[in-house]
A protein has these predicted regions:
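A short SAM/SAH-binding and catalytic strip from SAM-dependent methyltransferases
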Residues: 164-180
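A short glycine-rich, Lys/Arg-flanked "PGG" loop and its adjoining helix->strand segment in the class I
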Residues: 183-195
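A short acidic, Gly/Pro-enriched loop at the edge of an enzyme's catalytic core
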Residues: 146-166
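Class I SAM-dependent methyltransferase SAM/SAH-binding core
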Residues: 99-151
Length: 284
């Protein structure tokens, strides 16, 4: 075989392998999407709200690589913070703080920062970035209990404190799935920052589609409804979706946000893009 023929055969083999790899990649992607839709349809009909929340925390703790501390603030976040936060060295509470991405950024800007986070391994990382700030292992249920109810539980040290601002950690409001829980989280945040802003980021309804109506998704939903009826569980609203790396999510509409602002008697400023974010401001 001549060198030219060998080169030509090698190139044809490379093209064939590349095409085969592309086809395999498409098959894998379609399979992943189908399985995700099947699971979403089933789980949103078979699990209670509390079970969806605990599943979300568990998945959030598994996908550690998605929440690296080294990731800096996005441009929209930095612009947002500069526009609405009181000047440093104000004291800020960061909820659901993950590994401390916001904590590190705020401290570099001169703020004093306290935080809480439900995943213990993340709390350890976050604590190293908080300086003298308080970092607790707690979730939103603990937070609301400490601030709104009996002042007890893992978040008890926060009860009675006053902050100049509260930041609900990146996208964390998206994982608060029921209207009652959403109202309580916002009420607790406002109680700790009575004169300051509360900042929240989330999936916005216009930017995040509702659950897809695929054949596989409908099959999963049908199976989930049977299990849900047996367990006495109602189906989740269409605003709730499911992602392997995020768990369950709630996509907010303008009406949702306006309703939440009204319950705490706050002024609302919000933007759906590039990532949904809102500021709940005290009355002027």
């Amino acid at each position: 075989m001549t060198p030219e023929a060998a080169t030509d055969r090698g190139l044809r083999l490379l093209v064939s392998l590349t095409r085969g790899g592309a086809r395999l990649n498409r098959v894998v992607a379609r399979s992943q999407t189908a399985f995700k839709n099947l699971a979403e349809g089933f789980l949103t009909h078979a699990l209670s709200g509390a079970e969806m929340s605990s599943t979300t925390v568990a998945l959030y703790g598994v996908d550690a690589g998605a929440y690296e501390t080294q990731r800096s603030l996005s441009d929209w976040e930095r612009d947002w913070y500069e526009a609405v936060l009181p000047p440093a060295p104000a004291r800020v509470l960061v909820t659901a703080a993950g590994k401390g991405r916001e904590v590190a950024a705020l401290r570099s800007m001169g703020y004093t920062v306290d935080a809480f986070e439900p995943v213990e391994s993340y709390v350890e990382r976050c604590s190293k970035l908080a300086g003298d700030g308080l970092v607790l292992t707690a979730d939103y249920l603990d937070f609301c209990r400490a601030v709104l109810d009996d002042g007890q539980g893992p978040a008890a040290p926060l009860a009675g404190r006053v902050f100049d601002a509260v930041i609900l950690g990146w996208g964390s409001l998206t994982h608060v799935l029921t209207r009652d829980e959403q109202q309580r989280v916002l009420a607790a945040s406002c109680a700790l920052s009575p004169q300051g802003p509360v900042l929240a980021s989330f999936f916005a309804r216009g930017a995040t589609a509702a659950r897809p109506e695929s054949r596989v998704g409908r099959l999963g939903a049908a199976a989930g409804r049977l299990v849900g009826r047996f367990r006495g569980v109602s189906a989740a609203p269409l605003q709730i979706g499911f992602f392997w790396n995020l768990g369950f999510t709630y996509a907010y509409s303008a009406e949702d946000l306006e309703g939440l602002a009204a319950t705490v008697e706050r002024q609302l400023e919000w933007q759906p893009e590039p990532y949904g974010h809102a500021t709940f401001l005290p009355p002027s």
